[in-house]
């Protein structure tokens, strides 16, 4: 389970952002997780809930997870399609000259603070 490492990295980034903006307490954090990022949202949330208990800045902070759809682009027919449904093979022209546009990333979208 690598989700714990991703949670620790996210918490480190949140601390840096909070320090730069003189934030003392965070109410909620929105994290975007790509459909093919290999991070399982349920495990991420479980690790988050465990990790923030030790963090005064984040204690009781709500975690909001938003999925990023996995979209693949076909270089031959220049169309986009759902990676989850079709994988690497383009459903329009059957080409395998494709690459992932979105869905592999994990990013902090929003941090809501308490004044």
Segment roles from a protein language model:
Residues 74-77, 90-93:
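Short cysteine-rich clusters marking metal-coordination/redox-active sites
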Residues 82, 95-99:
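Short functional micro-motifs and their immediate structural scaffolds
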